[in-house]
Regions:
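Short beta-strand/turn micro-motifs composed of small residues
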Residues: 5-7, 69, 91, 164, ...
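N-terminal glycine-/charge-rich "phosphate-binding" loop or analogous flexible N-terminal tail
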Residues: 1-66
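Short, polar loop motifs at secondary-structure junctions
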Residues: 32, 53-54, 71-75, 92-95, ...
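Phosphate/diphosphate ligand-binding glycine-rich loop within oxidoreductases
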Residues: 63-139, 153
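Residue-level detector of alpha-helix initiation sites
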Residues: 115-119, 146, 159, 167
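Rossmann-like dinucleotide/phosphate-binding beta-alpha-beta segment
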Residues: 150-196
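Short gly/ser/thr-rich secondary-structure transition/capping motifs
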Residues: 45-53, 66-71, 140-148, 192-196
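Conserved beta-strand segments of alpha/beta enzyme cores
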Residues: 45-47, 108, 182
Length: 196
């Protein structure tokens, strides 16, 4: 099974849009090998082709069955990639690929829904703690060389309302809950493991 990995070089207005983002989101041969080593029954059947942008896209996709990518040339994909069975988008969202009328018949497309939950939980926890502790006002006062006492009690015992407790909001709720804050949620169904 040939897997074509299409990485993107960073560019303004694109993804990734910084050199740091390119380093985070690039799937190197080592990263690919590390990811598949936990699945020896499958990994022995895989060959990978690591590519950049569309440098070798058409020639490599002639015999690729799997495409691992953020974006791709959608025009004439059935002709360019006649053996393609599966496209996996490395992001959680696929809105940039809409409308999906370009997907050849018989090709499955999947995404990384939930992959950003851990980082979103950390970012959300940081944001909640900063707001609770008046850090934006403290930073503004410091910049203005003003000293005002701004106090905050511990967050334990406070209530946080999370609007949307999918994978991202749920991760924030769990992180804040671990500090003793209660969570309210605004979703139509209860997510297991989140106390309301």
């Amino acid at each position: 099974i040939k897997v074509h990995v299409k990485n993107n070089r960073w560019a303004n207005g694109s993804f990734p849009n910084t050199p740091e983002g390119e380093a985070v989101f690039t799937i190197t041969q080592q990263r690919f090998d590390d990811a598949v080593c936990d699945f020896p029954d499958v990994s022995s059947k895989l060959t990978s082709f690591i590519d950049w942008d569309t440098d070798n896209f058409e020639s490599s996709m002639r015999d690729a069955e799997v495409l691992l990518t953020w974006d791709l040339p959608m025009e004439n994909l059935a002709e360019v990639a006649p053996n393609l069975k599966w496209i996996h988008c490395i992001g959680a969202g696929v809105e940039h690929m809409l409308p999906m009328n370009w997907i050849p018949q018989g090709v499955t497309i999947t995404n990384n829904k939930g992959v950003h939950a851990e980082k979103a939980g950390e970012f959300g926890l940081m944001s909640v703690l900063m707001l609770h502790s008046n850090i934006p006002a403290v930073a503004t006062n410091q910049r203005l060389k003003v000293y005002d006492s701004l106090y905050a009690s511990p967050i334990a015992g406070k209530t946080l309302v999370v609007l949307g407790t999918g994978s991202l909001g749920g991760a924030v709720a769990k992180k804040v809950q671990a500090l003793g804050a209660a969570n309210g949620q605004s979703q139509g169904h209860v997510k297991h493991g989140i106390k309301t």
